[in-house]
């Protein structure tokens, strides 16, 4: 890593940590590299809510809006629960489901800010195809590559 790249990353981590301190969390987008789907995830939410959220397969603008919406929705509740369908999160009346994430390997910025020992539960927001069928349910038209289940 060059000195310029190191300086950029150091500054980015500093700004991210400062924003988390001011607002409680950030949403970190990870763009597609052409071989994997984009995803966005919260960092810092575990300090107030006890968990983090992630959404795969949608661009950062959409995922950012959905994740912020869910943070507000869960603020005064027990939080996500597995396989519960939630209304009013996506446009056109589509529901989302929540599922626990099995591996935390994709959340490197979280580890960079909070350390390797920080392992809060991550909940994935799963969205359906245009017929309302969720992956991995039979008949879902969304491929594993299009919306990886973490």
Segments (PLM) and residue ranges:
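A structural motif
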Residues: 39-43
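Acidic, proline/glycine-rich low-complexity IDRs
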Residues: 1-31, 45-49, 54-150
């Amino acid at each position: 890593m060059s000195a310029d790249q190191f300086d950029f990353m150091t500054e980015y981590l500093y700004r991210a940590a400062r924003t988390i301190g001011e607002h409680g969390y950030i949403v970190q987008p990870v763009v597609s590299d052409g071989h994997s789907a984009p995803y966005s995830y919260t960092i810092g939410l575990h300090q107030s809510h006890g968990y983090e959220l992630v959404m795969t397969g949608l661009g950062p603008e959409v995922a950012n809006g959905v994740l912020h919406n869910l943070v507000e929705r869960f603020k005064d509740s027990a939080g996500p629960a597995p396989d519960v369908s939630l209304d009013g999160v996506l446009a056109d009346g589509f529901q989302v489901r929540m599922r626990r994430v099995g591996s935390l390997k994709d959340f490197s910025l979280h580890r960079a800010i909070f350390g390797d020992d920080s392992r809060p539960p991550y909940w994935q927001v799963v969205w359906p195809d245009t017929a309302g069928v969720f992956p991995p349910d039979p008949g879902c038209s969304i491929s594993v590559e299009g919306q990886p289940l973490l």
